């Protein structure tokens, strides 16, 4: 019944198994991949006919994690998986980026890749396995895919590269880098690093590339057993159309791309395009070509003209040379009520970035396959349509916004102070108000400034820069701080963020084969120069964190109480803690280890809450004097609340010097009194005294009398000695 085929290799000290022919047999390609005890199913289905009216590759990638993979049931009312989580969205993009450039030009068939996590062993992150399984399924599917690709995760522990570190090793690593590519070339890099050098980063990329070669060989071996016949793809020769169009509009198109201002340039290019379309579709005549085809040729011509111009003259669209960064204006503290804010403008790209500080109540609970954890640093990126002069629908967060936000998050996280030193929940929001290239890196720069403006003690300021590449044969140009057009028309999008000490994040997407290690080395070196320049421009606005937190930010004080006192501080059903919060106005968070965080924008509220909590969590000391309130008057004495929630008895004989006939002659309920703790009776009840304390000054009269008596005893002896 099953026509099963499989291959198995040892990879990074663990078995990797790829199997097809048993599960999801009606898909064009289906592979069950197992690494350790983590299992994923990758399927590929491509439509039989091209999609009408599109001039792009209609590819969708969906990665989904099933909670049963970790032996868990989903939360919520419906008890089933809902919309994609952030992790699922990010891994979907991670798979999409290296496979998209490998589809044959002209492939317009709707293609869907679905990857499902079936089992998770809590050791091997499924993302790498998902990439490998997707590559294998595509290679088997018959779709025109110029793969296969391999992928690997690279760590850096104790100054050594580690292949596919397990989840328990991740807290120790200085690097979390994912690299994917073919046997000849690197196509995609995604990473977070703790201020590592460019040499270490490049070494990690090449280490990963070398170590996923056995995976590519395994996929090829599986394809030799089970691959479907390749689909036919008719490639249309448009060289004659391009030659005719080039003669018609070349000079005008070159002139349009010499206009530095983006909107003016777009308008000029639009007019040239209208001229080309009018030429190929004369009124009253039967058109010889499809309009979409002519538009596609025009797009190709645009790319060639921009690329030729850069390689031939060294000048870019806006007149810069390959290494120059656009003019930068950095401002901090631009919003009066925000805890921290910055406006970062680089050319026609602008980000308004705002930092908000919160407490433990604001932490984000993340439900993942590995379990639930709390996230204390959030970075959200918003890209409204007005930022590129367009109209559009506002609504849910798009995949691109999630991806760009995570890239900036990775760049900033390594320079944040440890949570035990700065116990705030931090949310950074980047509003892209203008965009013409590398808005994610503008978000990094703006986030660094906004955090420092809020008083967050970053290790060092952080900046980011986007690099591009034009490669034609042996000639190439690495471009610093690319424009949007250079991103679309170039061969590489290479984003690097970091401090003056090293790289904190690297993301690379390469659209073609042939990018050598030497080219990547040049790009990293040029990116470092650009990053240092940007940091210098940012320092004109703010070069270090402000000494004080933002005026409107909450203050947090942290201290510890004995764990056996937590229940008393919280009270039955939270009664005590609610009373503390209501009466002091401070927020209180108590952790299982006894760590208490008290937060408020009012310092007096914090002091009052701390005093209250400490009075509950600690024990009164015998012989100490305390202020208290009479809470109950009895015939035999008065009960006084004197130490947080603790009450004690002042016996009628301890109310005042001399004989007291009635307790009410001395005190009444609500009176503020000063008492001394005498001790505890045989039943553990607290014994207090008022008569040994001066009710005006709080002085210990008993101690005073003893001191005076001692002085009198010593006086005759001193006189005799004289």
Curated annotation (Swiss-Prot):
Which Cys pairs are S-S linked? none
Give the residue ranges for region: Disordered. 691-722
Q: Where in or outside the cell?
A: Cytoplasm
Entry EC no(s): 2.7.7.8
- Keywords of this protein's UniProt record, alphabetized? Cytoplasm, Magnesium, Metal-binding, Nucleotidyltransferase, RNA-binding, Transferase
In alphabetical order, the GO MF annotations are: 3'-5'-RNA exonuclease activity; magnesium ion binding; polyribonucleotide nucleotidyltransferase activity; RNA binding
Q: Name one GO cellular component term.
A: cytosol
Q: Which reaction does it catalyse?
A: RNA(n+1) + phosphate = RNA(n) + a ribonucleoside 5'-diphosphate
The UniProt record lists the KH domain at: 554-613
Read off the CDD domains from this record.
Answer: KH-I_PNPase, RNase_PH_PNPase_1, RNase_PH_PNPase_2, S1_PNPase
Residue limits of the S1 motif domain? 623-691
**Reported cofactor(s):** Mg(2+)
Entry keyword Glycosyltransferase: no
Entries under NCBIfam families matching the protein = polynuc_phos (TIGR03591), PRK11824.1 (NF008805)
Homology family: Belongs to the polyribonucleotide nucleotidyltransferase family.
The UniProt function text for this chain reads: Involved in mRNA degradation. Catalyzes the phosphorolysis of single-stranded polyribonucleotides processively in the 3'- to 5'-direction.
Q: What is this protein called?
A: Polyribonucleotide nucleotidyltransferase
- Organism per entry: Rhodopseudomonas palustris (strain BisB5)
């Amino acid at each position: 019944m099953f026509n099963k085929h499989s291959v198995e290799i040892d990879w990074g000290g663990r078995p990797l198994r790829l199997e097809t022919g048993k599960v999801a047999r009606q898909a064009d390609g289906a592979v069950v991949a197992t690494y350790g005890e983590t299992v994923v199913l990758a399927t590929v289905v491509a439509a039989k006919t091209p999609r009408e009216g599109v001039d792009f590759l209609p590819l969708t990638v969906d990665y989904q994690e099933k909670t049963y993979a970790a032996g868990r049931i989903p939360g919520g009312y419906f008890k089933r998986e809902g919309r994609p989580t952030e992790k699922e969205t990010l891994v979907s993009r991670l798979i999409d980026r290296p496979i998209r450039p490998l589809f044959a030009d002209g492939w317009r068939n709707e293609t869907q890749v679905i990857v499902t996590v079936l089992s998770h062993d809590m050791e091997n992150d499924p993302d790498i396995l998902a990439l490998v399984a997707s590559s294998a399924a595509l290679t088997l599917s018959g779709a025109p895919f110029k793969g296969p690709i391999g992928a690997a995760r690279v760590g850096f522990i104790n100054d050594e590269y580690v292949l596919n570190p397990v989840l328990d090793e991740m807290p120790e690593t200085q690097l979390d880098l994912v690299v994917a590519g073919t046997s000849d070339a690197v196509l995609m890099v995604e990473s977070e690093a703790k201020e590592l050098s460019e040499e270490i980063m490049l070494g990690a990329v090449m280490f990963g590339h070398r170590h996923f070669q056995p995976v590519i060989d395994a996929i090829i071996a599986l394809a030799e057993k089970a691959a479907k016949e390749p689909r036919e793809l008719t490639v249309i020769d448009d060289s004659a159309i391009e030659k005719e169009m080039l003669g018609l509009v070349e000079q005008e198109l070159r002139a349009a791309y010499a206009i530095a201002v983006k909107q003016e340039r777009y308008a000029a290019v639009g007019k040239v395009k209208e001229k080309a379309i009018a030429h190929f579709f004369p009124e009253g005549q039967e058109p010889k070509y499809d309009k979409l085809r002519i538009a596609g040729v025009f797009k190709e011509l645009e790319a060639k003209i921009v690329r030729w111009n850069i390689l031939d003259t060294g000048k870019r669209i806006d007149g810069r040379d390959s290494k120059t960064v656009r003019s930068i204006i950095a401002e901090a503290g631009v919003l009066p009520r925000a805890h921290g804010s910055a406006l970062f403008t680089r050319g026609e790209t602008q980000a308004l970035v705002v930092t908000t500080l919160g407490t433990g109540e604001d932490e984000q609970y993340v439900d993942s396959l590995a379990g639930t954890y709390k996230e204390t640093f959030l970075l959200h990126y918003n890209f409204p349509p007005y930022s590129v002069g367009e109209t559009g629908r506002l609504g849910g967060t798009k995949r691109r916004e999630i991806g760009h936000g995570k890239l900036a998050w990775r760049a900033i996280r390594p320079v944040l102070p440890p949570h035990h030193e700065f116990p705030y929940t931090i949310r950074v929001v980047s509003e892209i108000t203008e965009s013409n290239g590398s808005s994610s890196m503008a978000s990094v720069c703006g986030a660094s400034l906004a955090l420092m403006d809020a008083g967050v003690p970053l290790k060092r300021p952080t900046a980011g820069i986007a690099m591009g590449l034009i490669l034609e044969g042996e000639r190439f140009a690495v471009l610093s701080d690319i424009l949007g057009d250079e991103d679309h028309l170039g061969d590489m999008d290479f984003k690097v963020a970091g401090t003056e000490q090293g790289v904190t994040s690297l993301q690379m997407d390469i659209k073609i084969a042939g990018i050598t290690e030497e080219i990547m080395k040049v790009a990293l070196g040029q990116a470092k120069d650009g990053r240092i320049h940007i940091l210098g421009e940012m320092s004109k606005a703010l070069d270090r964190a402000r000494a004080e937190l933002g005026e409107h930010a909450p203050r947090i004080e942290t201290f510890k109480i004995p764990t056996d006192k937590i229940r008393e501080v919280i009270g039955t059903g939270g009664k005590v803690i609610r009373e503390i919060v209501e009466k002091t106005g401070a927020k209180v968070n108590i952790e299982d280890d006894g760590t208490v965080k008290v937060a408020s924008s009012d310092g007096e509220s914090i002091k009052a809450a701390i005093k209250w909590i400490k009075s509950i969590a600690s024990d009164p000391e015998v012989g100490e004097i305390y202020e208290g309130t009479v809470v109950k008057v009895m015939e035999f004495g008065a009960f006084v609340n004197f130490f947080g929630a603790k009450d004690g008895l002042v016996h009628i004989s301890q109310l005042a010097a001399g004989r007291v006939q009635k307790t009410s002659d001395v005190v009444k309920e609500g009176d503020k009194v000063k008492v001394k703790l005498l001790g505890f009776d045989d039943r553990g009840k607290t014994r207090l005294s008022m008569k040994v304390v001066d009710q005006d000054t709080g002085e210990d009269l008993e101690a005073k009398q003893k001191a005076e008596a001692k002085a009198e005893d010593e006086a005759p002896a001193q006189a005799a000695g004289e």
